[in-house]
Design a protein with these regions (language model features):
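A short SAM/SAH-binding and catalytic strip from SAM-dependent methyltransferases
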Residues: 26-40, 58-59
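Short beta->alpha connector loops
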Residues: 14-15, 34-39, 120-122
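Short, hinge-like loop/turn segments at secondary-structure boundaries
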Residues: 5-9, 26-29, 71-75, 130-132
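Conserved SAM-binding strand-loop segment of SAM-dependent methyltransferases
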Residues: 4-20
Length: 143
């Protein structure tokens, strides 16, 4: 924030990043917001234009708790990371880790690093072995 000498901007990401010149940042970060933008592919392309690398994180809809809720309740899951009911959520593009990996492959986005964690931002053996089932938060470095 400003008191820590960090510039903070608030803007509509769906309108793009036109106010920034190409390659004006080393990193561009999209934290826990991918699921709320209208055109994720366009935004990631814009982020890659503006920054040398980007960091994207999102809640994993493939986590076992979401699957259990859908299976047994037959309703869209409500979790710590996705706390809204389907009818009042800002989320419009929920995805799993596997969905995002395929999305990156299909769009030639090169993932250079990934970190899959639980809601406390801790990695475990299970999040490493079966990330799509046990990871709650996915973070990717892309160039």
């Amino acid at each position: 924030s400003l008191k820590n000498n960090v510039n903070v901007l608030q803007m509509d990401l769906d309108k793009g990043l036109n106010s920034f010149e190409s390659n004006s940042f080393d990193y561009v970060v999209l934290a826990q917001s991918l699921q709320v933008v209208k055109k994720p592919k366009d935004l990631i392309n814009e982020m890659l234009r503006v920054g040398k690398e980007i960091i994207v994180s999102f809640p994993n809809m493939g986590h076992w708790s979401s699957r259990i809720q859908l299976l047994f309740k037959g309703m869209m899951p409500i979790t710590t990371n996705l706390p809204y009911r389907w009818d009042n959520t800002p989320n419009i593009h929920l995805c799993t880790i596997k969905d995002f990996l395929k999305f990156c492959r299909d769009n030639n986005f090169e993932i250079t690093e990934q970190c899959i964690t639980n809601k406390k931002q801790k990695s475990s053996l299970l999040t490493k072995i079966i990330p799509n089932l046990f990871g709650e938060i996915a973070t990717f470095r892309i160039k």
